[in-house]
């Protein structure tokens, strides 16, 4: 029987997707990071694990004469990603993809799938540890030529995880190479924008959304009672996000008639007044190896013409009320000071002049007026981030096979570096149906 090899990244998302498609564990899993191997072993105990540099694993010895049906490669993407910015890059790390050529030469996998960031096609020589713009893509073309020289047909595309059932817009580059004479196949999207005819007509399911991944039972503490006040940049993000996704939204997303949530990015500034955030009823933007997302909740209560009358006991579910103190005045002061102002100001300073708006923090929900009575914020949990990547809800992320706990930072890092499992499942089903179980893709 043909075996499956995964030179995986992060928490083992490709292995998970492959398992969902085939109904079996990958046979060989390779990663240099002990923490990544520990998480993989906890979830895929039947795999043979190599905690080594990919160049130190002998493909012939590892396979032991068994034919390879699929070899998956997720070489480190940090030194290709635009998120790297203008920082110097390392030639050795950028060259990790060449290990796929070694496997093609020595054990000739029937199908090779390589995953990376979209900038992978710009792979070229370096000058002073920076990409040489005059030779952009030169090394990538050599890489493709090497695969073809060993008898592989090659094709590549960029895909979005939300189109295959993951509640994130994460975009990735995929290269498929095969040497069995069969055609390379790209999976058809299963999900789409809910406003398009493809979805309204029933051809596709609607994108899964960020709202699905959030545990609404976790408290969201008030931004006004924190021991350490939030910095001005974060306050501006919150205010701009509330303005765009709640106050100015004709149809704000409301949870159980009690709160209006949104997500903000906790780092990464944009110029001007651009909002670094998103509505909760869209797929999550790309999650990286650090937790950049803050859940902001505007607690709302019915607004009466005579003014705000109650802190609203109904806000206790599904998120417990932040405090019994009336924060209405603080909410109004906050919105006045940070309502899209370019610089903003501290809440301890005198209020800016209130201009044309008579009321701040009023939200219209299905024709009824509500008022924001408090604002909470918390970071997304590692479990929520794994949910956004499309991992199964029972995927073990907080401990290894021996029960040793991982810190949250390690959990988030494994998540951000992982392949969303729905990608791998869809690609394997499209190209290796003979190895797959008969059920359709499980991504809802």
Annotate each predicted stretch with a short phrase.
Residues 1-4:
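Extreme N-terminal starter segment of soluble prokaryotic enzymes
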Residues 8-12, 415:
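Class I SAM-dependent methyltransferase "Motif I" SAM/SAH-binding loop
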Residues 11-22:
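Conserved SAM-binding loop of SAM-dependent methyltransferases across substrates and taxa
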Residues 26-28:
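Short beta-strand element of Class I
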Residues 33:
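Conserved SAM/SAH-binding beta-strand->alpha-helix loop
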Residues 38-65:
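S-adenosyl-L-methionine
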Residues 59-70, 77-327, 332-346, 352-353:
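Class I S-adenosyl-L-methionine
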Residues 372-408:
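FAD-binding beta-loop-beta segment adjacent to the flavin cofactor pocket
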């Amino acid at each position: 029987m043909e075996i499956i090899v995964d030179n995986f990244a992060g928490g083992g998302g490709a292995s998970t997707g492959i398992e969902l498609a085939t109904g079996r564990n990958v046979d060989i899993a390779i990663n240099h990071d002990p923490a990544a191997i520990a998480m993989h072993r906890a979830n895929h105990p039947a795999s043979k694990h190599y905690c080594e540099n990919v160049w130190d694993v002998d493909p012939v010895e590892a396979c032991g004469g068994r034919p390879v049906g699929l070899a998956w490669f997720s070489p480190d993407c940090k030194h290709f990603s635009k998120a790297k910015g203008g920082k110097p890059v390392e030639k050795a790390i950028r060259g990790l993809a060449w290990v796929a050529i070694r496997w093609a030469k020595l054990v000739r996998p029937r199908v090779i799938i390589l995953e990376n960031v979209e900038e992978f096609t710009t792979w070229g020589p370096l000058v002073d540890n920076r990409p040489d713009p005059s030779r952009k893509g030169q090394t990538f073309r050599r890489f493709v030529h090497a695969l073809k020289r060993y008898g592989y047909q090659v094709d590549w595309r960029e895909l979005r995880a939300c189109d295959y059932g993951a509640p994130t817009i994460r975009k990735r580059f995929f290269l498929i190479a095969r040497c069995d004479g069969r055609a390379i196949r790209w999976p058809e999207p299963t999900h789409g924008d809910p406003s398009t005819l493809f979805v309204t007509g029933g051809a596709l399911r609607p994108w899964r959304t960020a709202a699905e991944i959030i545990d609404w039972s976790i408290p969201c503490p008030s931004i006004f009672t924190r021991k350490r006040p939030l910095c001005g940049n974060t306050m501006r993000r919150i205010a701009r996000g509330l303005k765009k996704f709640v106050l100015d939204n004709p149809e704000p997303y409301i949870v159980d008639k009690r709160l209006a949530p949104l997500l903000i990015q906790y780092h990464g500034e944009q110029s001007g007044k651009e909002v670094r955030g998103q509505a909760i009823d869209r797929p999550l933007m790309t999650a990286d190896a650090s937790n950049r997302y803050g859940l902001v909740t505007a607690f709302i209560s019915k607004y009466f013409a005579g003014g705000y009358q109650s802190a609203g006991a109904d806000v206790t579910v599904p998120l417990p009320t932040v405090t019994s103190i009336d924060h209405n005045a603080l909410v109004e002061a906050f919105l006045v000071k940070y309502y899209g102002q370019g610089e903003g100001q501290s809440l301890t300073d005198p209020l800016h002049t209130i201009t044309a708006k008579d009321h701040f923090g009023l939200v219209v929900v299905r024709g009824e007026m509500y008022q924001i009575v408090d604002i909470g914020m918390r970071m997304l949990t590692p479990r929520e981030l794994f949910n956004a990547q499309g991992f199964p809800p029972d995927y073990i992320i907080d401990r290894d096979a021996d029960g040793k706990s991982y810190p949250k930072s390690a959990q988030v890092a494994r998540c951000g570096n992982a392949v969303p499992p729905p990608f791998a499942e869809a690609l394997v089903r499209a190209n290796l149906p003979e190895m797959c179980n008969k059920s359709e893709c499980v991504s809802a």
